Amino acid sequence: MLRLPENSRPVVRPTEGGLIMQYVDPHIHMVSRVTDDYKRMALAGCVLVSEPAFWAGFDRSGPEGFRDYFRQLTQFERKRAAGYGIEHRCWLCINAKEAENVSLSRQVIAMIPEFLDDPGVLGIGEIGLNKNTRNEATVFLEHLDLAARRQELVLVHTPHLADKYQGTRMILDMIHDESRISPERVCIDHVEEHTIRLALHAGHWVGMTLYPVTKCTPARAADMIEMCGPERIMANSAGDWGHSDPLAVPELIFEMRRRGHDDALIRKVVFDNPLSFFGQCPRFRFTLRSGASSRE
């Protein structure tokens, strides 16, 4: 077993039989990242990113702002990623922070079907709760209804910090009550030690978000994989305009290798699992440029 020195990143020069492992970042907000990040991610082994619709850092003034945003996700960002050999997919919704405005949310939800037939769209997300309010729950349920009617995959945002456990329970209960959506077609994101088993036991996929300060570190993510096993578990950077690291997934690869885990297990979490989850979307097509592996 090859062991890497402590406190170092994985080598970033792709070589035959070397340390680079191809990976997928299933949750990253590239519209808020500089183009140089695409290059760094490609050098580190990233071959595919999945970008959920999210908060811009401020509340948008009206529904047309979301139409422009959805065009950015489905058109411009895909081209920017392709320039560095990275495939780009996206999810559409109005985020939980703006869901307090139910009237605006309904206008945005009514707009989403215009974009759902785009081959780069994976489904509805990231929907969920922020402060666990009644309005947020109303908008979450209406997103679920759209997903059920259109048979779309769902990516769910769970609340931060003190609101996480209660919000996760509320989310799981609402999904359970929506009998038209199979649990394996939903990913519960931003899980931590006190919520991961709840989501897995409900039959959902889960995402671990690797943040420098909040949510989950690579070491804690490795602990959770050791605790729960690799089935239906994914890891992401959720990189955005805040304090985040677009190379967080390679940091997890390094941590897992440092602990002596087999590359096949690591690859399952950072590559195979995202492709399996995305593969439930009939629009999803992905082929590695190297021809080493594909998902049709």
Where are these regions (language model features)?
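Active-site glycine- and acidic-residue-rich loops that bind
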Residues: 98-103, 209-218
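Short, acidic/turn-prone active-site loops that include or flank metal/cofactor-
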Residues: 53-57, 210-215, 239-240
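Histidine/acidic-residue-rich catalytic or RNA/ligand-binding cores of hydrolases
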Residues: 34-36, 164-173, 196-201, 216-225, ...
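Short hydrophobic/aromatic-enriched beta-strand-loop microsegments
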Residues: 48-51, 205-212, 286-287
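Mid-to-C-terminal alpha-helical segments outside catalytic/metal-binding sites
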Residues: 2-17, 250-296
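Short acidic/histidine-rich active-site segments
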Residues: 230-246, 266
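Mid-domain alpha/beta scaffold segments of enzyme catalytic cores
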Residues: 2-162, 166-174, 186, 190, ...
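Short helix-capping segments at alpha-helix termini
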Residues: 82-84, 177-182, 228-229, 258-264
